[in-house]
């Protein structure tokens, strides 16, 4: 139990900016971190929904409310996944050789091919949130998105070969086993059931299209880089979540 607690605290401090008790980082904690990735998604989703509720009752324009709700998940995660999204976009859109793309992926410099997709991403996410607010959708639906995205991304991270140059991707997989992947599958099934209860048939569409968006993102990166990494996981997660927000914004 102590090892699981340590894994949870390590995961919470790694993937969010939320304050956590001090624990010493070691291999016992690392191998349990991924088990809690969907739970981290639940925590983010709950906080996101609370902000959605508070913003919705503000006497402010829908544009201001949408802006606040759009940036909340990125702030909670410390922009961690956005960094991966930008790095991957910069590498893929460079249209260089595989070796050069891998070099760009590790480069800390930010290029135009990273900034332009980021602007597009924010426009899409803002538009989806604006539509959700305009329809006065249930705040509970926002909780689903971070759970779905993290369950699917974690499954692929644990199931696919990592890029040799990826220290972070290898680090997250250290000591994991089939039970970790099983946790992701079970979590996704439970989330699917809850999605159907809240959204009827649209719940199935939400889970399937988010999962498809993540799968296509991962497979594209495997083709471009020869494997998956922490940056690739962040890229796929961001894609999956913007797909989810757009779906919630479109469905009646």
From Swiss-Prot:
Cofactors: Mg(2+)
GO CC terms of this entry: plasma membrane
Classification via Pfam families: CobS (PF02654)
Major location category of this protein: membrane
Keyword hit for Membrane: yes
Annotated transmembrane regions: 4-24, 38-58, 62-82, 113-133, 138-158, 188-208, 232-252
GO BP annotation list: cobalamin biosynthetic process
Documented EC number(s): 2.7.8.26
Protein's membrane topology: Multi-pass membrane protein
GO terms for MF: adenosylcobinamide-GDP ribazoletransferase activity; cobalamin 5'-phosphate synthase activity
Catalytic activity field: alpha-ribazole + adenosylcob(III)inamide-GDP = adenosylcob(III)alamin + GMP + H(+); alpha-ribazole 5'-phosphate + adenosylcob(III)inamide-GDP = adenosylcob(III)alamin 5'-phosphate + GMP + H(+)
Pathway where this protein functions: Cofactor biosynthesis; adenosylcobalamin biosynthesis; adenosylcobalamin from cob(II)yrinate a,c-diamide: step 7/7
Subcellular location: Cell membrane
Keywords: Cell membrane, Cobalamin biosynthesis, Magnesium, Membrane, Transferase, Transmembrane, Transmembrane helix
Family note: Belongs to the CobS family.
Protein name per UniProt: Adenosylcobinamide-GDP ribazoletransferase
Gene label: cobS
């Amino acid at each position: 139990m102590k090892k699981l607690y340590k894994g949870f605290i390590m995961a919470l401090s790694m993937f969010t900016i939320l304050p956590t008790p001090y624990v010493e980082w070691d291999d016992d904690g690392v191998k349990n971190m991924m088990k809690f990735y969907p739970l981290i998604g639940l925590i983010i989703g709950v906080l996101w929904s609370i902000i959605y509720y508070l913003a919705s009752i503000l006497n402010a324009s829908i544009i201001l409310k949408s802006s606040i709700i759009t940036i909340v998940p990125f702030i909670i995660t410390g922009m961690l996944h956005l960094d991966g999204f930008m790095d991957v976009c910069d590498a893929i859109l460079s249209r260089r050789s595989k070796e050069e793309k891998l070099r760009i992926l590790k480069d800390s410099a930010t290029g135009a091919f990273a900034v332009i997709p980021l602007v597009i991403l924010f426009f899409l996410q803002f538009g989806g949130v604006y539509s959700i607010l305009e329809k006065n959708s249930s705040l509970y639906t926002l909780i689903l998105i971070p759970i779905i995205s993290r369950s699917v991304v974690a499954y692929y991270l644990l199931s696919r070969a990592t890029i040799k140059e990826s220290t972070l991707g290898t680090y997250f997989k250290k000591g994991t086993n089939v039970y970790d992947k099983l946790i992701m599958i079970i979590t996704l099934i439970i989330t699917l059931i809850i999605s159907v209860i809240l959204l009827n048939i649209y719940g199935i569409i939400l889970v399937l299209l988010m999962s498809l968006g993540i799968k296509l993102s991962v497979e594209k990166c495997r083709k471009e880089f020869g494997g998956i990494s922490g940056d690739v996981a962040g890229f796929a997660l961001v894609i999956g979540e913007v797909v989810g927000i757009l779906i919630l914004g479109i469905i009646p």
